[in-house]
Amino acid sequence: MSERIHASLARMFDEHRLVFWYDTARDMREAFDSFVLDGVEKVEISGNEFGLKYRMLRQEPKQRFLIYKDGPEPVMAENWLLDLQLATVVFKADQAAIWMAELGLPAQFESVVREHTEFYRAKVRVDALKRFMQASDTQTQMRLRMLAVCAGAEGGLDTVIEALLGELAAGKDDALRLIERSGLTEMFWTQVGQAYGYRSDEPDFEDFAISLFQSAYARALAEDGPLNAEALLVFRRWKNNRHWAGAFEELSARYQDLLKIPADLLKRDFRTLVATDHFEEIDRHIIRQIVQAMSTQTVSAPEVLTWVRERRQSHWYPKYVDIYQAISFATEFQQAMAEANLGMTSPAEGVKRYVTSWYKLDQLYRKFIYHMQKSSHVSLLADLYDAVENRYTNSFVLAVNDAWQDQIAGLSEWKIPGFASQADFYRDQAAEYRRKDQKV
């Protein structure tokens, strides 16, 4: 205690020449007697007010004085040093006063300290508050900074909300309990109500979180939600912050069924959801609807490619990246099939067409199969797989095979002008390396 008193008094003397100290409980005499600070003279009020005033104002006008009274502060009418006291500062030696002195707070901030004493009991919290404080802070702003410290945040109310959402996702309530112990709960909910429109007779943070997800989803679809537009901005910033990705996914999964999102999606055209990613089920719904539309060929290739490109911004895109890529390659395959001319008038023309364009159909088909199998969500692509497989087999492989068969049926010699046979390729390109026993 004596060290903190010494530090608090030292800070006061950095800004004031005179410091008054009233020992109301008469239990600080030892602390006063032990106080020593270079350049500071200790004096005691004991019926000698006029003598002290003359000394401090006339005899030693530059000297710094600690003016101590062993007892309470007199009423104003009987305080003969009141004019000096009003022009300087009074040191109060109770714990709240020490905290105020440490923070350099003026008297009008006394309630900010005395109403929230639990907050100030930890030096780490007081030190954090010091870092955040601004000279222009109001009492409300000070309490908001205290909320940020309790939540481990470093900004305004929005960052407090983000931190508390993270704690909620982790199944913890340490910050909320500290806010309660610090006497900041009522102020917190008042601020939340004013900022985001949350109203409840019995406010609860999980209830607020559910309302936040519900409102963000509704407002993203141009509908009204229980919270205001400012809440949507906070939600978006939190959702898109990589630091909170895990917390967002946890709460999104927790509230998806609670808010009956899967049932709601069944009533919506997936085109209205392309820019929305508040729940994982949205991606699955969009994928199913695109696959169905592609399977029945009721959407154009440019439309599908645009939707897939827009979904790259989705929070869940990395999880479904192979499905989206499979859809893209299936779309390109179908588009290429629609534009392909699979006829040939000679074997040479058939080979030339394959190496210049038809090979892309094989390539797109194989990329579709690769990403579908890699996705681990094969069932989502089942209808599209059937459509692509049927078209690849019957409209491409079978068509090319029939046309090719017609051309080679009339050949007396298996040679195609301008293209080397396998035997010629080996002789011209590979045999030389084998003779030198080289690996290729």
Residue ranges and their predicted role:
Residues 1-437:
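…; additionally, a secondary subgroup of soluble metalloenzymes is captured
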